[in-house]
Swiss-Prot record:
This is Large ribosomal subunit protein uL4. One of the primary rRNA binding proteins, this protein initially binds near the 5'-end of the 23S rRNA. It is important during the early stages of 50S assembly. It makes multiple contacts with different domains of the 23S rRNA in the assembled 50S subunit and ribosome. Forms part of the polypeptide exit tunnel. Belongs to the universal ribosomal protein uL4 family. Residues 54-76 are annotated as: Disordered. Keywords: Ribonucleoprotein, Ribosomal protein, RNA-binding, rRNA-binding. It comes from Staphylococcus haemolyticus (strain JCSC1435). GO terms for cellular component: ribonucleoprotein complex; ribosome. InterPro entries: Ribosomal_uL4 (IPR002136), Ribosomal_uL4-like (IPR013005), Ribosomal_uL4_dom_sf (IPR023574). Pfam families: Ribosomal_L4. One of its GO terms (molecular function) is rRNA binding. One of its GO terms (biological process) is translation.
Length: 207
């Protein structure tokens, strides 16, 4: 267990929180992390690519010329692959690129990603944001006060509409819940801001 500073949105220290080293301070497993990122990227692919083979191309129902006597090579249809406008051979067909990964590996990847951010000092814990209404300007000021880079992942305990709407129009800022936290979002961000309650929830799930 290790103690981490908890900040207020004005940058002052609010207190500290004790979090498990098995979640936030492990030696990152790069190979598992790489596999988890590839898995997520693969599942994001649409896989709607398609071409028409010789049976799907329109036309070509009759034989273009008789079998014998013309001196030309025999042909059965003008939609054979060697013809212009003919069907495609072994072309792409619609498919899903998604594949599965064992739960233990997925959780190890998450712990590795979080530990990497902590190790690089790109991990900030705040007590809470406490927005009573969506305020983009105020949220931008919070990021400036906390000295955050352009690409930031904000993690809240549960869905916070005011935080989501405040951050929605700021380029490079993404909001997630503790339950929806994933490896691709963490590694894509330069820094992670997480509320104290969200950090506890993540520790509970991954610990």
């Amino acid at each position: 267990m290790a103690n981490y500073d908890v900040l207020k949105v004005d940058g002052s220290k609010s207190g500290s929180v004790e979090l498990s080293d098995s979640v936030f301070a492990i030696e990152p497993n790069n190979s598992v992390l790489f596999e988890a990122i590839n898995l997520q990227r693969a599942s994001l692919r649409q896989g709607t690519h398609a071409v028409k083979n010789r049976s799907a191309v329109r036309g070509g129902g009759r034989k273009p010329w008789r079998q014998k006597g013309t001196g030309r090579a025999r042909q059965g249809t003008i939609r054979a692959p060697q013809w212009r406008g003919g069907g495609i051979v072994f072309g792409p067909t619609p498919r899903s690129y998604a594949y599965k990964m064992p739960k233990k590996m997925r959780r190890l990847a998450l712990r590795s990603a979080l530990s990497f951010k902590v190790k690089e000092n790109n991990f900030t814990i705040v007590d809470n944001f406490g927005f009573e209404a969506p305020k983009t300007k105020e949220f931008k000021n919070v990021l400036t006060t906390l000295e955050q880079p352009k690409k930031v992942l904000v993690v809240t305990d549960s869905e916070d509409v005011n935080v989501e709407l405040s951050a929605r129009n700021i380029p490079g800022v993404q909001v997630s819940t503790a339950q929806g936290l994933n490896v691709l979002d963490i590694t894509s961000a330069d820094s992670v801001i997480i509320t104290e309650s969200a950090a506890k929830k993540v520790e509970e799930v991954l610990g």
